[in-house]
Regions:
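DUTPase catalytic domain/fold
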Residues: 1-148
């Protein structure tokens, strides 16, 4: 699948994929001046990129494992819908214990193209605390209920 994109100026770094089999496309910080993200704080980082996302797809912004593990920087959950045609910004959270500097050209996130299945919710009236919506072997056990 080929996706059209634009750089907002000539200095914006082109997204890269380290290996042909990688799911994500790495994107870079497009900053004039470095910024510092203090522990337990966030910053919105511009990429200088716009993407033409086809109908029936979305871009999901994901962590890069290296900055999450080495620097304590996590990407805030992002879904970029096909109708959005503005610049992509990355919401970075510093969950570590030391300030982190972000500079122009730093790899900050990866974009993954995901097919979207449109759904329409159907409200079921009644006492859902007594009657499950569906019957399954798993049941209604929540976090950690299947072991591990």
């Amino acid at each position: 699948m080929i996706i059209q994109y634009q750089r907002l100026d000539e200095y914006v770094k082109i997204p890269t994929r380290s290996n042909p089999s990688d799911a994500g496309l790495d994107v870079y910080a497009n900053l004039r001046d470095p910024i510092i993200i203090e522990p337990r704080e966030s910053a919105i980082i511009p990429t200088g990129l716009k993407f033409g996302i086809p109908h029936g797809y979305m871009l999901q912004v994901m962590n890069r494992s290296s900055i999450a593990a080495k620097r304590g920087l996590m990407v805030g959950a992002h879904v970029i819908d096909s109708g959005y045609d503005g610049e992509i910004f990355i919401n970075l959270h510093n969950v570590g214990h030391s300030p982190q500097m972000i500079r122009y050209g730093d790899k900050i996130a990866q974009l993954v193209m995901v097919p979207v299945v449109a759904f329409r919710p159907n409200l079921i009236e009644g006492d859902l605390y007594r009657e499950p919506i569906t019957i399954s072997d798993r049941g209604d056990g929540a976090l950690g209920s299947t072991g591990g």
